[in-house]
Regions:
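Negatively charged, low-complexity tracts enriched in Asp/Glu with abundant Ser/Thr
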Residues: 1-48
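A short, structured beta-strand/loop element
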Residues: 47-82
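Mixed-charge, Lys/Arg-enriched low-complexity segments
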Residues: 2, 6-7, 71-114
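Compositionally biased, intrinsically disordered low-complexity segments
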Residues: 19, 39, 55-58, 101
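Weak global preference for isoleucine
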Residues: 3, 8, 36, 54-55, ...
Length: 114
């Protein structure tokens, strides 16, 4: 059994919304681009995949990047959006703040398994 990529990719080009906790409101936009990283089976046999999305939110001057995941329970054919929360932010924030930290962590992880 595998996750049907077309079911996950069908969201590209469709409206999305993101609601902040509290009183910060809701962003609405369009999912412009998506890449899938296959994660494999969990301990219960459910299938997982991580998605990296580029979203163009209304009124924002640059696209935002979001990372989330889908889960397909054993015995089903429909993957479901499973991220309770996601990290979503402008591309410049990822480039300037998040990617340098991820690079450090990946380097440490690679050294620890070498």
């Amino acid at each position: 059994m595998s996750i049907d990529k077309s079911k996950i990719m069908k969201a590209v080009g469709k409206p999305v919304r993101m609601t902040y906790p509290g009183s910060e409101g809701t962003h609405r936009g369009v999912l412009n681009f998506r890449e899938i990283a296959w994660s494999g089976k969990g301990r219960t046999g459910a299938l997982y995949c991580t998605v990296v999305d580029i979203i163009r939110f209304d009124g924002k001057r640059e696209p935002w990047l979001r990372i989330g995941y889908y889960r397909q329970p054993t015995g089903t054919t429909l993957p479901r959006w499973a991220s309770q929360t996601t990290y979503c932010g402008p591309l410049s924030q990822w480039r300037n703040n998040v990617l340098p930290v991820l690079q450090k962590l990946l380097k440490r992880a690679a050294q620890s398994i070498a």
